[in-house]
Protein backbone atom coordinates (compact mmCIF):
# COMPACT_ATOMS: atom_id res chain seq x y z
CA UNK A 1 0.00 0.00 0.00
CA UNK A 2 1.40 3.38 -1.03
CA UNK A 3 1.70 6.28 1.40
CA UNK A 4 1.14 9.97 0.77
CA UNK A 5 1.64 12.92 3.12
CA UNK A 6 -0.75 15.83 3.32
CA UNK A 7 -0.78 19.14 5.17
CA UNK A 8 -3.97 20.49 6.73
CA UNK A 9 -5.14 23.79 5.24
CA UNK A 10 -6.29 26.24 7.90
CA UNK A 11 -9.19 28.67 7.46
CA UNK A 12 -10.93 29.79 4.31
CA UNK A 13 -8.86 30.32 1.20
CA UNK A 14 -9.66 32.63 -1.69
CA UNK A 15 -9.28 31.79 -5.36
CA UNK A 16 -6.06 33.80 -5.34
CA UNK A 17 -4.76 31.76 -2.38
CA UNK A 18 -5.50 28.50 -4.21
CA UNK A 19 -3.77 29.77 -7.36
CA UNK A 20 -0.64 30.60 -5.37
CA UNK A 21 -0.82 27.17 -3.75
CA UNK A 22 -0.95 25.41 -7.12
CA UNK A 23 1.93 27.52 -8.43
CA UNK A 24 4.12 26.05 -5.66
CA UNK A 25 3.42 22.50 -6.87
CA UNK A 26 0.76 21.72 -4.28
CA UNK A 27 -2.80 20.53 -4.94
CA UNK A 28 -5.74 21.55 -2.73
CA UNK A 29 -7.76 18.54 -1.61
CA UNK A 30 -10.47 17.44 0.79
CA UNK A 31 -10.71 14.30 2.92
CA UNK A 32 -14.13 12.95 3.94
CA UNK A 33 -15.97 9.72 4.55
CA UNK A 34 -15.68 6.78 6.94
CA UNK A 35 -14.59 7.65 10.48
CA UNK A 36 -13.45 11.18 9.69
CA UNK A 37 -14.81 14.69 9.38
CA UNK A 38 -14.36 16.85 6.30
CA UNK A 39 -10.81 18.16 6.31
CA UNK A 40 -9.16 20.50 3.82
CA UNK A 41 -5.59 19.48 3.00
CA UNK A 42 -2.91 19.97 0.37
CA UNK A 43 -0.61 17.38 -1.21
CA UNK A 44 2.43 17.52 -3.45
CA UNK A 45 1.34 17.07 -7.07
CA UNK A 46 4.42 15.11 -8.16
CA UNK A 47 4.14 12.72 -5.20
CA UNK A 48 0.42 12.23 -5.84
CA UNK A 49 1.06 11.31 -9.48
CA UNK A 50 3.72 8.80 -8.41
CA UNK A 51 1.30 7.17 -5.98
CA UNK A 52 -1.53 6.95 -8.53
CA UNK A 53 0.80 5.34 -11.04
CA UNK A 54 1.77 2.80 -8.40
CA UNK A 55 -1.64 1.83 -7.02
CA UNK A 56 -3.94 2.64 -9.95
CA UNK A 57 -7.17 4.63 -10.16
CA UNK A 58 -8.97 2.46 -7.57
CA UNK A 59 -6.00 1.77 -5.32
CA UNK A 60 -5.91 2.31 -1.56
CA UNK A 61 -3.64 5.08 -0.27
CA UNK A 62 -2.35 5.48 3.27
CA UNK A 63 -2.86 9.24 3.64
CA UNK A 64 -1.15 11.10 6.44
CA UNK A 65 -3.45 13.79 7.84
CA UNK A 66 -1.95 15.62 10.79
CA UNK A 67 -0.94 12.98 13.33
CA UNK A 68 -3.31 10.37 11.85
CA UNK A 69 -3.04 7.91 8.99
CA UNK A 70 -6.24 7.36 7.01
CA UNK A 71 -7.00 4.70 4.40
CA UNK A 72 -8.42 6.54 1.39
CA UNK A 73 -9.29 6.13 -2.27
CA UNK A 74 -9.39 8.90 -4.86
CA UNK A 75 -13.09 9.66 -5.26
CA UNK A 76 -12.57 12.37 -7.87
CA UNK A 77 -10.04 14.84 -9.17
CA UNK A 78 -10.00 17.82 -11.52
CA UNK A 79 -7.38 18.40 -14.20
CA UNK A 80 -6.64 21.55 -16.20
CA UNK A 81 -5.44 20.42 -19.66
CA UNK A 82 -4.31 23.92 -20.63
CA UNK A 83 -1.96 24.19 -17.66
CA UNK A 84 -1.31 20.43 -17.54
CA UNK A 85 -2.07 20.61 -13.83
CA UNK A 86 -4.18 18.75 -11.27
CA UNK A 87 -6.33 21.42 -9.64
CA UNK A 88 -8.24 19.53 -6.92
CA UNK A 89 -8.55 16.07 -5.36
CA UNK A 90 -11.32 14.37 -3.36
CA UNK A 91 -10.01 11.69 -0.99
CA UNK A 92 -12.66 9.28 0.32
CA UNK A 93 -11.87 7.66 3.68
CA UNK A 94 -12.91 4.00 3.49
CA UNK A 95 -13.78 1.00 5.63
CA UNK A 96 -11.41 -1.77 4.49
CA UNK A 97 -13.99 -4.47 5.30
CA UNK A 98 -16.84 -2.85 3.37
CA UNK A 99 -17.43 -3.74 -0.29
CA UNK A 100 -17.52 -1.02 -2.91
CA UNK A 101 -18.63 -0.96 -6.54
CA UNK A 102 -16.24 0.81 -8.90
CA UNK A 103 -15.38 0.98 -12.61
CA UNK A 104 -12.35 -1.10 -13.57
CA UNK A 105 -10.72 -0.68 -17.01
CA UNK A 106 -10.60 -3.57 -19.50
CA UNK A 107 -7.25 -4.19 -21.22
CA UNK A 108 -7.14 -6.28 -24.40
CA UNK A 109 -4.18 -8.66 -24.64
CA UNK A 110 -2.72 -10.06 -27.86
CA UNK A 111 -3.71 -9.75 -31.51
CA UNK A 112 -6.97 -11.35 -32.64
CA UNK A 113 -6.61 -14.12 -35.24
CA UNK A 114 -9.42 -12.48 -37.19
CA UNK A 115 -7.52 -9.19 -37.32
CA UNK A 116 -4.71 -10.93 -39.19
CA UNK A 117 -7.29 -11.89 -41.83
CA UNK A 118 -8.46 -8.31 -42.25
CA UNK A 119 -11.12 -8.24 -39.53
CA UNK A 120 -11.61 -5.19 -37.34
CA UNK A 121 -11.47 -5.42 -33.53
CA UNK A 122 -14.22 -3.38 -31.88
CA UNK A 123 -14.41 -2.83 -28.12
CA UNK A 124 -17.83 -1.56 -27.02
CA UNK A 125 -17.03 -1.97 -23.31
CA UNK A 126 -13.98 -0.23 -21.87
CA UNK A 127 -14.86 -0.50 -18.16
CA UNK A 128 -16.50 -3.14 -15.99
CA UNK A 129 -18.44 -2.55 -12.78
CA UNK A 130 -16.71 -4.53 -10.06
CA UNK A 131 -17.77 -5.08 -6.43
CA UNK A 132 -15.15 -6.01 -3.83
CA UNK A 133 -13.51 -4.89 -0.63
CA UNK A 134 -10.94 -2.13 -1.33
CA UNK A 135 -7.91 -4.40 -1.11
CA UNK A 136 -9.44 -6.88 -3.61
CA UNK A 137 -10.37 -4.40 -6.34
CA UNK A 138 -8.24 -5.23 -9.41
CA UNK A 139 -6.29 -2.44 -11.08
CA UNK A 140 -7.52 -3.71 -14.47
CA UNK A 141 -9.09 -6.79 -16.06
CA UNK A 142 -7.23 -8.40 -18.95
CA UNK A 143 -9.05 -10.08 -21.84
CA UNK A 144 -7.02 -12.36 -24.14
CA UNK A 145 -8.30 -11.92 -27.71
CA UNK A 146 -5.69 -13.96 -29.61
CA UNK A 147 -8.15 -16.76 -30.51
CA UNK A 148 -10.98 -14.53 -31.72
CA UNK A 149 -11.83 -15.10 -35.39
CA UNK A 150 -13.91 -12.87 -37.66
CA UNK A 151 -17.51 -12.69 -36.33
CA UNK A 152 -16.39 -13.97 -32.90
CA UNK A 153 -17.21 -11.98 -29.78
CA UNK A 154 -16.17 -12.04 -26.13
CA UNK A 155 -18.90 -11.44 -23.55
CA UNK A 156 -18.79 -10.58 -19.86
CA UNK A 157 -19.69 -14.20 -19.06
CA UNK A 158 -16.50 -15.34 -20.83
CA UNK A 159 -14.26 -13.47 -18.39
CA UNK A 160 -12.46 -15.78 -15.98
CA UNK A 161 -12.52 -14.09 -12.57
CA UNK A 162 -9.23 -14.83 -10.83
CA UNK A 163 -9.70 -12.68 -7.73
CA UNK A 164 -12.10 -12.11 -4.87
CA UNK A 165 -14.46 -9.74 -6.68
CA UNK A 166 -17.78 -9.80 -8.55
CA UNK A 167 -18.50 -8.34 -11.99
CA UNK A 168 -21.88 -6.60 -11.96
CA UNK A 169 -22.38 -6.14 -15.72
CA UNK A 170 -24.95 -8.12 -17.72
CA UNK A 171 -23.29 -11.48 -18.54
CA UNK A 172 -24.46 -11.21 -22.16
CA UNK A 173 -22.92 -7.77 -22.63
CA UNK A 174 -20.26 -7.77 -25.34
CA UNK A 175 -16.75 -6.73 -24.32
CA UNK A 176 -15.01 -7.11 -27.66
CA UNK A 177 -15.90 -8.43 -31.11
CA UNK A 178 -14.15 -8.97 -34.44
CA UNK A 179 -16.22 -7.72 -37.36
CA UNK A 180 -15.64 -8.46 -41.07
CA UNK A 181 -13.64 -5.89 -43.03
CA UNK A 182 -15.59 -3.31 -44.98
CA UNK A 183 -15.03 -3.50 -48.73
CA UNK A 184 -13.59 -0.15 -49.71
CA UNK A 185 -13.58 0.77 -53.43
CA UNK A 186 -10.26 0.60 -55.25
CA UNK A 187 -8.68 3.70 -56.82
CA UNK A 188 -9.84 2.52 -60.26
CA UNK A 189 -13.43 2.14 -59.01
CA UNK A 190 -13.36 5.60 -57.40
CA UNK A 191 -12.05 7.18 -60.63
CA UNK A 192 -14.72 5.36 -62.65
CA UNK A 193 -17.50 6.60 -60.36
CA UNK A 194 -16.16 10.17 -60.54
CA UNK A 195 -16.04 9.92 -64.34
CA UNK A 196 -19.64 8.74 -64.53
CA UNK A 197 -20.77 11.60 -62.30
CA UNK A 198 -18.93 14.13 -64.47
CA UNK A 199 -20.47 12.87 -67.75
CA UNK A 200 -24.06 12.98 -66.52
CA UNK A 201 -25.85 16.05 -67.94
CA UNK A 202 -27.57 18.13 -65.27
CA UNK A 203 -31.25 18.81 -65.67
CA UNK A 204 -31.88 22.34 -66.93
CA UNK A 205 -34.90 23.57 -65.03
CA UNK A 206 -35.15 26.85 -66.91
CA UNK A 207 -35.57 25.17 -70.29
CA UNK A 208 -38.45 23.05 -69.03
CA UNK A 209 -40.22 26.13 -67.74
CA UNK A 210 -39.79 27.94 -71.07
CA UNK A 211 -41.19 24.95 -73.01
CA UNK A 212 -44.18 24.73 -70.66
CA UNK A 213 -44.81 28.46 -71.09
CA UNK A 214 -44.75 28.21 -74.90
CA UNK A 215 -47.26 25.34 -74.84
CA UNK A 216 -49.59 27.34 -72.58
CA UNK A 217 -49.46 30.33 -74.95
CA UNK A 218 -50.36 28.11 -77.93
CA UNK A 219 -53.33 26.71 -76.01
CA UNK A 220 -54.58 30.25 -75.27
CA UNK A 221 -54.40 31.17 -78.95
Swiss-Prot record:
Residues 184-221 have a biased composition (Acidic residues). The keyword Lyase does not apply. GO terms for biological process: translation. CDD domains: Ribosomal_L25_TL5_CTC. One of its GO terms (cellular component) is cytosolic large ribosomal subunit. It comes from the Bacteria. The keyword Lipid biosynthesis does not apply. SUPFAM superfamilies: Ribosomal protein L25-like. Residues 174-221 are annotated as: Disordered. Pfam families: Ribosomal_L25p, Ribosomal_TL5_C. Keywords: Ribonucleoprotein, Ribosomal protein, RNA-binding, rRNA-binding. InterPro entries: Rbsml_bL25/Gln-tRNA_synth_N (IPR020056), Ribosomal_bL25/Gln-tRNA_synth (IPR011035), Ribosomal_bL25_b-dom (IPR020057), Ribosomal_bL25_C (IPR037121), Ribosomal_bL25_long (IPR001021), Ribosomal_L25_dom (IPR029751), Ribosomal_uL5_bac-type (IPR020930). GO terms for molecular function: 5S rRNA binding; structural constituent of ribosome. Part of the 50S ribosomal subunit; part of the 5S rRNA/L5/L18/L25 subcomplex. Contacts the 5S rRNA. Binds to the 5S rRNA independently of L5 and L18. HAMAP family: Ribosomal_bL25_CTC (MF_01334). Belongs to the bacterial ribosomal protein bL25 family. CTC subfamily. NCBIfam families: bL25_bact_ctc, PRK05618.2-4, PRK05618.2-5. This is one of the proteins that binds to the 5S RNA in the ribosome where it forms part of the central protuberance. This is Large ribosomal subunit protein bL25. It comes from Staphylococcus haemolyticus (strain JCSC1435).
